[in-house]
Amino acid sequence: MGQKINPLGFRLGTTQSHHSLWFAQPKKYSEGLQEDKKIRDCIKNYVQKNTRLSSGVEGIARIEIQKRLDLIQVIIYMGFPKLLIEDKPRKLEELQMNVQKELNCMNRKLNIAITRIGNPYGHPNILAEFIAGQLKNRVSFRKAMKKAIELTEQADTKGIQIQIAGRIDGKEIARVEWIREGRVPLQTIGAKIEYCSYRVRTIYGVLGIKIWIFIDEE
């Protein structure tokens, strides 16, 4: 049996960097981890409630958190930042207040910044949201996967692999379906591979979506 390792953890320090940058004493480490989860969940929930896209995509690629003694700096990498910024000028302030309320941090300042990423569909999180939206609307899984591959080809990637698992199309027995286009060298540490695993609730139950995107080789 092949041992499956997470492609992001496998490449930490070479082609991947950490999404949380801070130090803590061993006793306080779990608190810092919970704080990060609260921040990410709060931001995702806010974006979900306040942005409405026909494709059902929120457009968050990743959320980076940097902490100092007196400051928490949060950078949201978005594919479609206009949804959050241009709609209402006060949305960012409102989001900041929501996160501060959730954390209940009085001694530290919180700063949230938004960075736009080029080629949003070249990022697996945004692509997984797109596929999830299609599956919720009862589009055939093959059609959804092929459309996702077309979108990544426009983003100038070298290869993609998509896997969907669960009760696909409402069938009684759960199964795994996958499709690959181009090269996806999972064993090459120098290969820059983006990966995400995403859960979507459909009327037939929960489906798991996994996406590997090969961007470049060092």
UniProtKB/Swiss-Prot annotation:
Any one Gene Ontology molecular-function term assigned to this protein's record: structural constituent of ribosome
Gene Ontology CC terms: chloroplast; cytosolic small ribosomal subunit
CDD domains referenced in this protein's UniProt entry, alphabetically: KH-II_30S_S3
Disulfide bonds: none
Subcellular location: Plastid, Chloroplast
InterPro entries xref list: KH_dom-like_a/b, KH_dom_type_2, KH_sf_prok-type, Ribosomal_S3_C_sf, Ribosomal_uS3_bac-typ, Ribosomal_uS3_C, Ribosomal_uS3_CS
Any Pfam family: Ribosomal_S3_C
Alphabetical UniProt keywords: Chloroplast, Plastid, Ribonucleoprotein, Ribosomal protein, RNA-binding, rRNA-binding
Primary subcellular site in the record, as a coarse category: plastid
Keyword Transcription regulation: no
Gene Ontology biological process terms, A to Z: translation
KH type-2 domain mapped to chain residues: 43-118
PROSITE patterns named among the record's database cross-references: KH_TYPE_2, RIBOSOMAL_S3
Subunit and partners: Part of the 30S ribosomal subunit.
Stored NCBIfam families: rpsC_bact (TIGR01009)
Membership in a protein family: Belongs to the universal ribosomal protein uS3 family.
Name by which UniProt lists this protein: Small ribosomal subunit protein uS3c
